[in-house]
Amino acid sequence: MIQILITGLFLLAQPSEPQDSLTVTQQGRTIATVNREDFTMPLPGTPMVDYEKYSKFIKQLDQKVYREPINAVLNDHGSIVPGRVGYKLYQQAFMEKFYAYFYGQGPSKIEVPEMNIYPKVDSELLAHISTQQLGQYVTYFNSSNKSRSHNISLSAKAIDNHVVFPNETFSFNQVVGMRTRNKGYKSAPIIVKGELSEGVGGGICQVSSTLFNAVDRAGLQIVQRYSHTRSVPYVPPGRDATVSWGGPDFRFQNQYNQPILIRAKRYGGSMIITLYSSDVINSRLRKIPKAPSRIPKEINAEQ
């Protein structure tokens, strides 16, 4: 009798599943628990799935399951860092499992079926398109202006390792995104030759202008480019590309039959952008003037 009582108390202490529960797991980890009644339409007769509630559940589940793919990149030493396959909820396969549970009996458990999402740029492609240098351009700036230098580094990082596929159009504003304080950009107003220049995100146009000249050197098709209303000190006259979120953009198209890899890096007071592709690319390079190595004196307007 005592043994039976102890056994009963032991069973009561164990966690039990609700009679109609569905436990959804991902890689063995529980991510959702629901019941049949949560999705049953209030109609007499044979139970039916409330599709509106099911769709809402699937949307929430997909957000939990989703893992973004990561492209392969080149590190600062030129070595390939492999990418990562992402995945999302395989909705058709999950629906079949869910309906089997819904019209069945008792509790059930579903390990979410995942659908792989492969990165656009894998190690093999990156190795293929990083062999032939198409165009390079170097501009210079005053590295003692910390805020402006920071903005240059930040925007250069945004376009570094970006791959432009054949017939694809690159948009500077779209790739770099909005330049805000929340994203780390700083106010960098300076005075050059007595005129106030730049504000939050100051320095971005030097990156876009450096990119324009590298792109032009590589013989790529310029789709959209605007010059500043006045000359800028870091490129020859007429060789700049002003950009502004919600305003002017710099865009170019890859008309070649091979992808183009952008490498962008700030080294001290130099901004260097180099374009690479496959060694089988049939490119037509252009001659362009070099940037001035001496820049005019500037005054930090915040001081």
From Swiss-Prot:
Tree of life domain: Bacteria
Q: What is this protein called?
A: Uncharacterized protein YoaR
Per the UniProt record, the source organism is: Bacillus subtilis (strain 168)
* Gene name of the record: yoaR
